[in-house]
Amino acid sequence: MNVDFGNALAAEAVTGVSEASLERLDDRVADAHDRIEANIEARRFGYASLALPTDTDPDAIYEAVSGFDPEAVLTVGIGGSALGAETITAALGAESHYTLDNVDPAPTRQLLDELPLSSTLVNVVSRSGTTAETLANFLVVREAMADAGVDWTDRTVVTTGAEGPLRTLADAHDLPSCTVPEGVPGRFSALSAVGLLPAAALGCDIEAVLAGGAAGRESLAPSLFESPAYAYGAVAYATEQRGATTNAIVPYAEQLEPFAEWFAQLWAESLGKDGLGQTPARALGATDQHSQLQLYRAGRKDKLVTLVRPRERAGVDIPETDIDALSYLGGESLESLLDAEFEATEASLAAAGQPNVRIELDSLDAHGVGELLYGMEAACILYGELLGIETFTQPAVEWGKRAARGLLGGGDFEEAEAVADKTVRRVE
């Protein structure tokens, strides 16, 4: 993975950062790097995620899925319990991985009606084992399996903490299971069993994913000028300080579209503290050049645009044509067209003074996706260090969870009373 932040410099962008200020910031990056390294070694909460490439045991994951040869994998989880796995399987082309990460009844019913439940591996993921959406969906899935004549205990694997309702369930029914690693928040758990199990069940090389993460670990250095991950985290921080309060993540590869969703959770939930942090926006190149690019180029100069692409792509040739107006396309390829659009977008943003950063992978393979995920996690952690916030908590999210649980009769929570006290001004 490499990072090019030339278009985020003050010479190119309205909210860009000067070379001199980056030199000054680099002293803080060095100090933050030392703290991060010490916390990784101590496996402190949150920082332990940066040790996952070596701490994760791929054999334990393969063992958990060894009794299955699924036609499909259905992950029942939400947030970090689903997005990392979805990112990895999508990037690696494992199309038979599905997720239930919402409790919208219509798509849930449609998916369960379409899946071959007798040959589907159901992967239930919740660190606490108490996540309301996950448990509700699992109960719905279990009933659908029973209605289809499938013994759910024969087709279910669990990833959860060492204790909790899901762990109790797994032990009671002797279900194959993996343990969510200690000290790793869900949104940082992609390089653990949480993110890797569906890929392993579908025959992907999770050891190569971990090797990519290990390469990302090796690339961390006490200078933003020597570490791609820290370069990105530091430049994102510096541009936010200059008014770039939105970070638009734009992969130029459809297989990375779930990565943008994963990134949005990572960035928002980790950095949205104390009135600080960048708001993540998601787009897809080249599709959203025909929608969002107008805003990014001609709207407010309050954005950092992050463009992501693999250098190597599959080849699809564009046929020659006798239509004069289309002759410039004939003999080219879809990948050359997509790369041209990437570079044109990058240049157009720079010409408009909108800071942008290029992130490139050698190729979109198991090693590449592992390195990308690790790099973004390290960048996020560095950003949090520079902001001086608690990166690994999510108190605002917990408020909503308590309110919802109280409304459903799952306990006496004062947050639920705030919902009842809502001011109503309805127009009908």
UniProtKB/Swiss-Prot annotation:
Annotated EC: 5.3.1.9
Source organism of the structure: Natronomonas pharaonis (strain ATCC 35678 / DSM 2160 / CIP 103997 / JCM 8858 / NBRC 14720 / NCIMB 2260 / Gabara)
Principal location class: cytoplasm
InterPro entries, sorted: G6P_Isomerase, Phosphoglucose_isomerase_CS, SIS_dom_sf, SIS_PGI_1
Cellular component GO terms, alphabetical: cytosol
Function noted in UniProt: Catalyzes the reversible isomerization of glucose-6-phosphate to fructose-6-phosphate.
Keyword Membrane included in the entry's annotation: no
Family, as annotated: Belongs to the GPI family.
MF terms in GO: carbohydrate derivative binding; glucose-6-phosphate isomerase activity; monosaccharide binding
Cell compartments where the protein resides: Cytoplasm
Keywords, comma-separated and alphabetical: Cytoplasm, Gluconeogenesis, Glycolysis, Isomerase
GO BP annotations listed: gluconeogenesis; glucose 6-phosphate metabolic process; glycolytic process
Protein name: Probable glucose-6-phosphate isomerase
Coiled coil: none
Protein's pathway: Carbohydrate biosynthesis; gluconeogenesis; Carbohydrate degradation; glycolysis; D-glyceraldehyde 3-phosphate and glycerone phosphate from D-glucose: step 2/4
Highest classification ranks of the organism: Archaea, Methanobacteriati, Methanobacteriota, Stenosarchaea group, Halobacteria
The keyword Membrane appears for this protein: no
Active-site annotation: 269, 290, 401
Catalytic activity: alpha-D-glucose 6-phosphate = beta-D-fructose 6-phosphate
